[in-house]
Amino acid sequence: MFKKSYQFFALVLFSIFNVLVTSASAIDLDEATRTVVADSNGNTTVLTPEQVKRGKRLFNNTCGACHVGGVTKTNPNVGLRPEGLSLATPRRDNAAALVDYLKNPTSYDGLESIAEIHPSIKSGDIYPRMRSLTDEDLFSIAGHILLQPKIVTEKWGGGKIYY
């Protein structure tokens, strides 16, 4: 009798846990939050919920090892904060500029190609994770980078005081 009650109790607990865990969903972001700067002219675009999810997944899988939390592990002085992106030459604070950078990265001052040391489409032979990324994938990654300061605020690119 005790064994059957124990099994039933375990089954009920497992079911409750399973329902709570599988019913958890990502935060629903409103249209204003999903709006990012699209190009250097200041035009904006609204990311779809699918692009938001895809950008996060691709960023974490492709870029997250070196840019966790918006910080650059190899050079903490150059991160993914909006201020840092806007001061780069050329500016990288819009989706089109970030996509261009992911295709052909240059130094912060824009004078040298750094494709051999920074993953990019151009260096897909060195960084295999970049090989199969499409322009849509790159746009989703750029959207993720531009969206994070709105979601995690000062934590994005804030460094080890937050992570």
From Swiss-Prot:
One of its GO terms (cellular component) is chloroplast thylakoid membrane. One of its GO terms (biological process) is photosynthesis, light reaction. Coiled coil: none annotated. It is a peripheral membrane protein. Binds 1 heme c group covalently per subunit. One of its GO terms (molecular function) is electron transfer activity. It holds the Pfam family Cytochrom_C550. Its main location: plastid. Residues 1-26 form the signal peptide. InterPro entries: Cyt_c-like_dom, Cyt_c-like_dom_sf, Cytochrom_C550, PsbV_cyt_c550, PsbV_cyt_c550-like. PROSITE patterns: CYTC. It is found in: Plastid, Chloroplast thylakoid membrane. Keywords: Chloroplast, Electron transport, Heme, Iron, Membrane, Metal-binding, Photosynthesis, Photosystem II, Plastid, Signal, Thylakoid, Transport. Heme c binds at residues 63, 66-67, 118. Its cofactor is heme c. Belongs to the cytochrome c family. PsbV subfamily. HAMAP family: PSII_Cyt550. PSII is composed of 1 copy each of membrane proteins PsbA, PsbB, PsbC, PsbD, PsbE, PsbF, PsbH, PsbI, PsbJ, PsbK, PsbL, PsbM, PsbT, PsbY, PsbZ, Psb30/Ycf12, at least 3 peripheral proteins of the oxygen-evolving complex and a large number of cofactors. It forms dimeric complexes. NCBIfam families: PS_II_C550. One of the extrinsic, lumenal subunits of photosystem II (PSII). PSII is a light-driven water plastoquinone oxidoreductase, using light energy to abstract electrons from H(2)O, generating a proton gradient subsequently used for ATP formation. The extrinsic proteins stabilize the structure of photosystem II oxygen-evolving complex (OEC), the ion environment of oxygen evolution and protect the OEC against heat-induced inactivation. This is Photosystem II extrinsic protein V. The lineage of its organism: Eukaryota, Sar, Stramenopiles, Ochrophyta, Bacillariophyta.
